[in-house]
């Protein structure tokens, strides 16, 4: 229980928890956890209004930029939420890449609902783990760890968000969906959750002093062995069109639809029973002094820019707030050279800097929210 004390104490400063005593005089974990989750829900309007800045911009801690492609409305959106969950050492970042007729609405809906849902689930599971240190969430005999808490929180959140999206009265997600690539930084640890084919890349300093790119996520494409096996096992099909060699897509068993170029996504209920899932891959990394920054970007960037090129572009940008925009601009130029004749995709980038510059720190930017619509 000791290794959870600092986390729980931090929450206690932000959320008033009345611990209920049972007949034995012990704290009832379930009631305390339920109350914590209830408190979070009550604060939803506060979290969306006063104390948070809704702007299209960047600062010395994070840089955001999004550019519409040549296929119509920009279906990408992004979010950086500093002071996530009223915790000074936490930040939430996300890239959401929509697709289909309602893709831009789906992406915004997931962006708007995921952070708060994640926060509620995290608080509830954290309270249970703190008050019941032997709690076993994954069928093992091990005590639950911080990573287990975040993983279970993400799994519950993604399942809930996808279910709510399916029953949304104003958004038709049957043939539309979105990816979701998110990061939570908590102190000196980052937790990465990925649904879809957006990508997170870390810039790490090598022993020789140069920056090297470390890919933190998998691009969940239908031709990945484990993804293809699942899809075929659910009677879905995976193949490329004649005019798109190398672009594997997911198809219904008896129809030439929907042709989805990813194996995980929110929405797209026309193909969910045939192997598409919204289950995130969740990983963690302990931040070292050699870890400089993380780039989150939609697939439009990675179609024309390599991981190494991306970190070199960002690291060579003199001013941090301009880093995301410069990377997008370089990707636009690369697209025109490498993919001439193809309509340019939407391009969105979040750059999260892991160490403060002389004029920036997490505490100085506490409670700022940056949104790109």
Swiss-Prot record:
Q: What class of enzyme is it?
A: hydrolase
User: Under which EC number(s) is this enzyme classified?
Assistant: 3.1.3.16
Q: Which domain of life is it from?
A: Eukaryota
The record's PROSITE patterns line, in alphabetical order, gives: PPM_2
Q: Which cofactor does it need?
A: Mg(2+); Mn(2+)
Q: Indicate yes or no for the key word Magnesium.
A: yes
User: A Gene Ontology CC term for this entry?
Assistant: plasma membrane
Q: Which residues form the PPM-type phosphatase domain?
A: 61-354
* Entry note: cofactor: Binds 2 magnesium or manganese ions per subunit.
Q: Name one GO biological process term.
A: drought recovery
Q: Which residues bind Mn(2+) 2 per the record?
A: 97, 299, 345
Q: Which reaction does it catalyse?
A: O-phospho-L-seryl-[protein] + H2O = L-seryl-[protein] + phosphate; O-phospho-L-threonyl-[protein] + H2O = L-threonyl-[protein] + phosphate
- Span-the-membrane segments of this chain are none
- In this chain, Mn(2+) 1 is annotated as bound at 97-98
Residues in coiled coil = none
Write down the InterPro entries for this protein, in alphabetical order: PP2C, PPM-type-like_dom_sf, PPM-type_phosphatase-like_dom
Its name, as the record gives it, is Probable protein phosphatase 2C 73
The species is Arabidopsis thaliana (Mouse-ear cress)
């Amino acid at each position: 229980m000791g290794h959870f004390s600092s986390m729980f104490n931090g929450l206690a400063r932000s959320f008033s928890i009345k611990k209920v005593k049972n007949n034995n005089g012990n704290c009832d974990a379930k009631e305390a956890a339920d109350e914590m989750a209830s408190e979070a829900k009550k604060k939803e309007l506060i979290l969306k209004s006063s104390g948070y800045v809704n702007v299209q911009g960047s600062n010395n801690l994070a840089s955001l930029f999004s550019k519409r492609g040549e296929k119509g409305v920009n279906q990408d959106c992004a979010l950086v939420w500093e002071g996530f969950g009223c915790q000074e050492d936490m930040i939430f970042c996300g890239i959401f890449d929509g697709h289909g007729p309602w893709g831009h609405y789906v992406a915004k809906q997931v962006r708007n609902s995921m952070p708060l849902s994640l926060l509620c689930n995290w608080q509830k599971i954290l309270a249970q783990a703190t008050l019941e240190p032997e709690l076993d969430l994954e069928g093992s005999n091990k005590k639950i760890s911080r990573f287990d808490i975040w993983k279970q929180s993400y799994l519950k959140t993604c399942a809930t968000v996808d279910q709510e999206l399916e029953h949304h009265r104003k958004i038709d997600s049957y043939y539309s969906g979105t990816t979701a690539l998110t990061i939570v930084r908590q102190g000196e640890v980052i937790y990465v959750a990925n649904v879809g084919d957006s990508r997170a890349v870390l810039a790490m300093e090598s022993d020789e002093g140069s920056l090297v790119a470390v890919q933190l996520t998998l691009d969940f494409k239908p031709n990945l062995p484990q993804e293809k096996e699942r899809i075929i096992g659910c009677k879905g099909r995976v193949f490329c069109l004649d005019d798109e060699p190398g672009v594997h897509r997911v198809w219904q068993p008896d129809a030439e639809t929907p042709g989805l170029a990813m194996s995980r996504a929110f929405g797209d209920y026309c193909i969910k029973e045939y192997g598409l899932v919204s289950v995130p891959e969740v990983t963690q990394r302990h931040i070292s002094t050699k870890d400089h920054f993380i780039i989150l970007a939609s697939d439009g960037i990675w179609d024309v820019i390599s991981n190494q090129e991306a970190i070199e572009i960002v690291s060579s940008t003199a001013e941090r707030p301009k880093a995301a925009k410069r990377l997008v601009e370089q990707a636009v130029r690369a697209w025109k050279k490498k993919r001439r004749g193809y309509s340019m995709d939407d391009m969105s980038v979040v750059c999260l800097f892991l160490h403060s510059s002389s004029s920036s720190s997490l505490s100085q930017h506490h409670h700022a929210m940056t949104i790109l619509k």
